[in-house]
């Protein structure tokens, strides 16, 4: 696109001419990321002061100039490609660690700070930042949030989404907002996680930091087949064992790593696991015996504990070097990023291997196995067009196989442009429509990283919607009727928190089934009207536990009321009826999902103002866990973003925001 000279003049005043570049070399350097996408921007701005972000966006908004936020550009999905031209906003120079507070457990950082920089600053203080993508030495913390990247420790500690406490954020029109986990209403930090720069620009982040465990023990375990190794992971999950890390790799990976990094991986096995435990010596000793027994049951060849810290670090250096090791073998590496329920790993592996063999593709297989996330690393030469087409086709088939196994097309690498089309494998039309509405609420002019994440012309390609249950169908009909006659209503369960005061209530009491307690994946799926008492009774009978209190109210109320914010991170899947009567579905039994906007976080704490949650899938545990602390219920005033999204979803105010109602 042609950028008006007046816009250049205004931008130059803000950032200085040395930071606004249009020369061919600069634009070529910023025309690509780690994907195959190559698109030349019209200009490049180096952002060296956080205070200029909002003024820059105001100018871009005034002149309707699209922009792409960019830091280290380590993503594999084309998220940094400037598809509509416009301006690349390089936040990498904003790389200061502003504050570290070990007493309260947080750090404030600028968006260009890398994970490695933060870890180096924390280590002498005896602290660490839990998310650990393999590229943490170079990838930025804002990029991690934008992609919801996770890494090896996700199984125990969760992904980036779970470790961001506050952010300063700039909307595409230049409006600055501050978001905190203490805010009432929907979890907007969670919604921004994984949004790939399509909703605005991250200015600063406050991240959670944790004390380094005093005792950590790492094991290298070898197997005669990759199937045996991933079955081990499924069995660990089924036993409720949660190691600090569980990484798997095949012999193609180990050979490449040994030639490059000399990590000490045995070459006489078809697969290996890196398992890591932390805790007290007694806890580690108990779990070590369980680990070894499960590994032996699955035909392990060697069970080797790291004897020194140097040996432990060497094992992890090899794992982090896997991508670079494969990149030495060919001009290009295409990295897949599917996630399936942990119990489905063996079946997914079988499907993936069949696809790669049928296409005669040479690839390594690498897994964040503890959370069902795997990365086929396919080597090829993009200058060979038939080869590139074949590889791209195979990877799409791999992602379809993930969806067929109840999984997602992205666990942590995002969607960008390269996986945009396959979103239709995973989501039906109403859910994709909701993604569009979320984008429009934040960015009505579609200037922020346009044409990413959401498929183009998806109406006929979207996944067919599964049938609605009888109770859900009845509620959908009631919603449509009330919309038709303009009869606003309040969504209620047991009326334990909200006094309806004679208002037209819409009850979830007919949604009262516990649909599945899955002790293989350690998840439960239940309808929103199930009472917490009945749920607690059923879990106790099944010998499993959740963080939900055994008190008044329903599952849907616990999730939507805002009284149990620590429960949000436990929720993996959701179904909800929107104010137009359509049903949206997101997630499932997945420990990771970076495909699309996080709808679980949109409805969390939304107090029934955006739609009626019909069912949830959430984590359970093999051992007792502390109950979530409960806050008093107060009807919240609508946050700027809350009001904007509500206007998109519910323009007729069918489910009103009523501030000031007290707990009952």
What do the PLM-derived regions correspond to, one by one?
Residues 1-19:
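A charged N-terminal "starter" segment
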Residues 1-4, 427-482, 486, 638-664:
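Intrinsic disorder at enzyme termini
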Residues 17, 403-415, 444-448, 651-654:
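Alpha-helix capping/hinge segments and adjacent helical runs
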Residues 21-30, 207, 211, 217-394, ...:
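C-terminal substrate-recognition/cap domain of FAD-linked oxidoreductases
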Residues 25, 32-94, 368-369, 469-517, ...:
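Glycine-rich N-terminal segment of FAD-binding domains in flavoprotein oxidoreductases
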Residues 28, 76-78, 135-141, 247-259, ...:
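A glycine-rich phosphate-binding loop feature that marks nucleotide/adenosyl-phosphate handling sites
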Residues 96-100, 107-247, 448, 463-467, ...:
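FAD-binding subdomain of flavoenzyme oxidoreductases
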């Amino acid at each position: 696109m042609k950028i008006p000279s007046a816009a250049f003049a205004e931008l130059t005043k803000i950032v200085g001419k040395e930071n606004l570049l249009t020369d061919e070399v600069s634009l070529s350097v910023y025309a690509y990321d780690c994907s195959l996408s190559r698109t030349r921007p019209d200009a490049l701005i180096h952002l060296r002061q956080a205070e200029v972000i909002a003024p820059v966006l105001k100018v871009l908004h005034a002149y309707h100039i699209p922009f792409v936020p960019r830091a280290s550009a380590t993503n594999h999905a084309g998220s940094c490609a400037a598809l509509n031209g416009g301006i690349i906003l390089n936040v990498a120079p904003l790389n200061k660690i502003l504050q570290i507070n070990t007493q309260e457990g947080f750090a404030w950082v600028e968006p260009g700070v890398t994970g490695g920089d933060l870890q180096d600053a924390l280590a002498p203080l005896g602290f660490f930042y839990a998310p650990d993508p393999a590229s943490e030495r170079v990838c930025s913390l804002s990029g991690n949030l934008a992609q919801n990247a996770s890494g090896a420790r996700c199984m125990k500690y969760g992904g980036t989404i779970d470790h961001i406490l506050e952010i300063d954020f700039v909307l595409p029109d230049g409006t600055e907002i501050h978001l905190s986990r203490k805010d009432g209403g929907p979890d907007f930090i969670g919604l921004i996680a994984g949004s790939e720069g399509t909703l605005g620009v991250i200015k600063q982040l406050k991240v959670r930091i944790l004390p380094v465990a005093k005792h950590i023990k790492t094991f290298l375990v070898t197997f005669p087949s990759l199937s045996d190794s991933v079955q081990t992971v499924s069995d660990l999950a089924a036993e409720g064992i949660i190691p600090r890390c569980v990484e798997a790799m095949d012999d193609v990976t180990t050979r490449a790593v040994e030639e490059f990094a000399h990590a000490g991986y045995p070459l006489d096995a078809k697969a290996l696991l890196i398992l890591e435990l932390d805790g007290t010596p007694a806890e580690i000793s108990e779990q070590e015996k369980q680990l070894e027994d499960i590994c032996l049951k699955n035909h392990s060849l060697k069970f080797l504990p790291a004897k020194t810290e140097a040996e432990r670090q060497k094992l992890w250096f090899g794992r982090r070097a896997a991508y670079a090791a494969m990149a030495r073998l060919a001009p290009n590496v295409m990295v897949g990023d599917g996630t399936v329920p942990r119990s489905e790993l063996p079946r997914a592996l079988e499907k993936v291997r069949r696809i790669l063999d049928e296409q005669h593709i040479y690839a390594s297989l690498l897994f964040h196995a503890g959370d069902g996330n795997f990365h086929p690393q396919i080597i090829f030469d993009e200058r060979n067009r038939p080869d590139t087409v074949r590889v791209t086709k195979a990877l799409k088939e791999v992602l379809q196989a993930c969806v067929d196994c109840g999984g997602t097309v992205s666990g942590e690498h995002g969607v960008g442009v390269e996986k945009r089309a396959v979103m239709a494998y995973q989501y039906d039309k109403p859910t994709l429509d909701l993604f569009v509405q979320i984008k429009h609420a934040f960015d009505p002019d579609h200037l922020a990283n346009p044409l990413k994440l959401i498929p183009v012309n998806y109406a006929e390609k979207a996944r067919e919607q599964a049938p609605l249950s009888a109770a859900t169908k009845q509620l959908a009909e009631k919603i449509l009727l009330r919309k038709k006659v303009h009869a606003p209503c309040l969504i209620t369960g047991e009326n334990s928190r909200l006094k309806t005061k004679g208002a037209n209530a819409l009850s979830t009491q007919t949604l009262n089934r516990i649909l599945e307690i899955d002790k293989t994946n350690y998840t439960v799926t239940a309808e929103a009207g199930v009472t917490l008492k009945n749920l607690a009774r059923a879990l106790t009978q099944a010998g499993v536990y959740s963080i939900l209190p055994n008190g008044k109210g329903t599952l849907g109320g616990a999730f939507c009321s805002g009284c149990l914010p620590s429960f949000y991170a436990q929720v993996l899947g959701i179904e909800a009826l929107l104010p137009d009567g359509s049903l949206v579905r997101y997630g499932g039994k997945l420990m990771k999902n970076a495909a699309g906007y996080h709808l679980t976080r949109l409805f969390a704490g939304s107090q029934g103002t955006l739609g009626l949650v019909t069912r949830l899938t959430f984590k359970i545990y093999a051992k007792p866990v502390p109950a979530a602390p409960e806050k008093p219920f107060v009807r919240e005033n609508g946050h700027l973003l809350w009001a904007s999204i509500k206007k998109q979803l519910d323009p007729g105010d069918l489910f009103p925001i009523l501030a000031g109602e007290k707990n009952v």
